[in-house]
């Protein structure tokens, strides 16, 4: 027979929970938030310094060389090499993520993808599976996931840029999983050093790589702290950060696991 345990134990320091739900925004940041809310994406310039780009490229190459032919890492990227870790709370990005989602945020997933020469166009898709209503629910909740792409190679027509349909995060239906061009699609030619953030529910896809070189990207995605994460948060590198990291790092790494 199942034995009931009426004791409820909080196993984290409550001090890591933000005191305010929303940060204060200056005029520039407020303008960026409004743009994101309308169109579903934002390009952040100077999100990475030159030395960080060099470090990421070196770490990315070393990591995928060990994987022997594998072309993607779906989650737990930080467990592959601690040199990826600074992306977790990268200030230029976290500033925008908090401005949009609020201060109570968590890592949804940390992944990476290598698109080799000859890779095909992706089909249109959304990353979120929950239904969409642009008005949210009467109490105000809405499934929130923001993807952040750090492209380590300049995106061109040949190596495959990103295609999105601005504003489609509000559509009540999923896109057809086909290879075609929307008349109002936007092509983004991301540059190394930029971060491309976009709503997980926006219609998007990566185009095929017709060049002779690999296309490399690290994808660090965020959500509200109370949503389920794809990450396990239990690897040796992450476990160490959850013990000794900053309050923000602990929050991002799922330390508030119940309430």
What do the predicted segments below correspond to?
Residues 186-201:
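Short, conserved beta-strand/loop elements in beta-sheet-dominated catalytic cores
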Residues 1-39, 43-136:
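Non-heme Fe(II)-dependent double-stranded beta-helix
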Residues 155, 201-202:
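Short Ser/Thr-interspersed hydrophobic loop/turn segments at strand-loop and sheet-helix junctions
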Residues 2-21, 195, 202, 207-259:
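Non-heme Fe(II)/2-oxoglutarate
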Residues 36, 79, 100, 107, ...:
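A generic fold-level signal
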Residues 119-190, 227-234:
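Catalytic core of non-heme Fe(II) oxygenases with the double-stranded beta-helix
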Residues 81-84, 183-184, 205-207:
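Active-site rim elements
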């Amino acid at each position: 027979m199942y034995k009931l345990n009426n004791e409820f134990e909080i196993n984290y320091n409550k001090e890591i929970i933000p005191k305010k739900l929303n940060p204060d925004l200056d005029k520039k940041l407020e303008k960026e938030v409004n743009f994101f809310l309308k169109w579903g994406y934002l390009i952040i310039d100077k999100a990475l310094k030159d030395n960080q780009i060099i470090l990421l490229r070196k770490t990315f190459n070393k990591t995928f060389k060990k994987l022997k032919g594998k072309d993607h890492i779906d989650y737990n990227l930080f467990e592959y090499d601690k040199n990826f870790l600074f992306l977790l709370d990268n200030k230029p990005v976290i500033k925008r993520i908090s401005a949009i989602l609020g201060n109570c945020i968590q890592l949804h997933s940390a992944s990476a993808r290598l698109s080799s020469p000859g890779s095909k166009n992706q089909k249109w898709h959304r990353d979120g599976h929950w239904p969409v209503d642009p008005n949210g629910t009467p109490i105000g909740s809405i499934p929130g996931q923001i993807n952040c792409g750090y492209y380590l190679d300049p995106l061109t027509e040949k190596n495959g840029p990103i295609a999105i349909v601005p504003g489609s995060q509000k559509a009540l239906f999923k896109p057809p999983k086909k290879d075609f061009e929307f008349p109002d699609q936007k092509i983004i030619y991301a540059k190394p050093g930029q971060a491309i953030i976009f709503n997980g529910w926006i219609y998007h896809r990566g185009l095929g790589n017709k060049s002779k070189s690999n296309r490399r990207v690290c994808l660090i995605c965020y959500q509200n702290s109370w949503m389920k994460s794809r990450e396990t948060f239990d690897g040796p590198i992450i476990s160490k950060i959850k013990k000794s990291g900053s309050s923000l790092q602990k929050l991002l790494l799922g330390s508030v696991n119940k309430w």
